[in-house]
Amino acid sequence: MLAELPARSDREPVVGAGMGGDDTTAIDAAVERAVVARLDADGGGFTLVSEELGVRPGGETWVVLDPIDGSINAKRGLPFFSLSVAVAEGPTMGDVTFGYVYDFGSGEEWTAERGRGARLNGEPLRGEPPKDRIEILALEATRTDLVAGHTPSLVDFVHRLRIFGSLAISLCHLADGRVDAVCSLKAARAVDIAAAQLLVRERGYAIDLPEAPPFEAAPLDLEGRSRVVAAGTTGLCAAMAAALSE
């Protein structure tokens, strides 16, 4: 897919408006077409929820697709963007049974099955156990004013920040112990986290949507939005949520 769109001038033209409300770029559309075609070819009806196409009813199984998480990185050639696919047995976050995240930059494939753990390139995740402090926080935000407005409340319990530009990749890094917590200052949709959240939860880590219903009841749709906090322990996750409210 990327070989067909090698240059920035190929990837970034706006070709439409996604049902999620954002512009659809050429790379968004190309990846979505390829993934949906593959899913359709595998047969079996499913209800599709995709950032670009919207909701396509079709069966009791739900497939939640984010063709490109980190579109600006993808357009500019920064190697931090991903494909996310989640499979669910119903319309809520708690119904997700399988998650897949592909990191285009590193080539890493992250997967999780409900009740069967999380894996990286087919091997079980065995990262460092969660810490009781945050040495590295993966902060996801699109505007400098959001970062400037919230970082003062983080000073007391966060040592260092990293901003990758892909919420799904950040959550995968948390699941593997590469970062200690994740905080999205911009409200995210279900398509942004449906796959990666399962890796976090299968590791026994905590994740919350402060502006949404209880996490498991959060709908798999394109309307609901909430900031996201996640950490290795429920205490750290609660501290992050409290910092957001300040």
Can you name each region flagged by the protein language model?
Residues 1-68, 241-246:
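N-terminal subdomain of lithium-sensitive/metallo-dependent phosphomonoesterases centered on the IMPase/IPPase/PAP
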Residues 47, 136, 180-181:
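Short, Asp-centered acidic motifs that coordinate Mg2+ and/or phosphate
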